[in-house]
Amino acid sequence: MTATRKSTRPSKPLKATLVAYAKLMRLDRPIGIYLVLWPTLWSLWIAADGLPDWDVLVIFVLGVVLMRSAGCVINDFADRKIDGHVRRTANRPLVTGLITPKQAVLFFVALLVIAFILVLFTNPLTIKLSFGGALLAFCYPFMKRYTQLPQIVLGAAFAWSIPMAFAAQTNQLPEAIWVLYTAVVLWTVAYDTFYAMADREDDLKIGVKSTAILFGDQDRIITACLQLMALVAMAMAGERFGLGFSFKVSLLVAGGLFAYQQYLIRNREPNACFRAFLHNNWVGLVVFLGILVDKLITN
């Protein structure tokens, strides 16, 4: 009589739970990870003059995934009572009940703890800065209830990897990093306004505030101005960091990508606005390639 072979596959309830946590972290939609990762890579390559320490690089790539995931978890916790009223978010795990609010909070804390353990392998300056990053990640989701400029807080959170990367790689915070920081904040406000434009009608019904609502009919011109200012700030940062021709070319290409995004949102159609938001991944990549090529040439 042969013994019954036990299946090594996870049970359906376990599999459903794992999938729910992955969705809570937005691992099925990694665009947020990419948009935080690109400025991080820019900063590491500039700070290290083209050759980041491998351990610092690994710490920051993992840290970006963990902190972006933590931000998504606390965002869904904060929005759990309103997400059911928005078509795009109605199937999130906290809305459907696959994950409870208590489980979400515990998971958020766990992600922060793991990220902090990684930071402990850097230096005291980076460790100190990490508390600011955690605070920004926690605060952003709640800003949508109190200000029509929550995208600025999001930009501050997304750009926080810049000072942390310089601190980890060089143990210094040169003044020029704040020019690059400002550029990323401006860029983030622009592309997250596109994201908010896709949800504007639902947000108006449920009372959620955003720059898309604040800007109103002037949204296209204001986002275009934000993109232009972001490019100018990037160019200024590039001059201060001694970046050359390749970087300048990358900014010209980024400007062309911004122009295409403005074309996409011309009719303010929600799906097109969301496409414009997603398209910013290419902007981050192009700027990184400009920095990478510049460092390869100069070194």
From Swiss-Prot:
Gene3D superfamilies: UbiA prenyltransferase. Its EC number is 2.5.1.39. It is found in: Cell inner membrane. It is a multi-pass membrane protein. The chain crosses the membrane at residues 31-51, 54-74, 105-125, 148-168, 177-197, 241-261, 277-297. Its cofactor is Mg(2+). Pathway: Cofactor biosynthesis; ubiquinone biosynthesis. Keywords: Cell inner membrane, Cell membrane, Magnesium, Membrane, Transferase, Transmembrane, Transmembrane helix, Ubiquinone biosynthesis. It catalyses: all-trans-octaprenyl diphosphate + 4-hydroxybenzoate = 4-hydroxy-3-(all-trans-octaprenyl)benzoate + diphosphate. It comes from the Bacteria. GO terms for cellular component: plasma membrane. It is an enzyme of class 2 (transferase). Its main location: membrane. Disulfide bonds: none annotated. It holds the Pfam family UbiA. GO terms for molecular function: 4-hydroxybenzoate polyprenyltransferase activity. One of its GO terms (biological process) is ubiquinone biosynthetic process. Catalyzes the prenylation of para-hydroxybenzoate (PHB) with an all-trans polyprenyl group. Mediates the second step in the final reaction sequence of ubiquinone-8 (UQ-8) biosynthesis, which is the condensation of the polyisoprenoid side chain with PHB, generating the first membrane-bound Q intermediate 3-octaprenyl-4-hydroxybenzoate. Belongs to the UbiA prenyltransferase family. This is 4-hydroxybenzoate octaprenyltransferase.
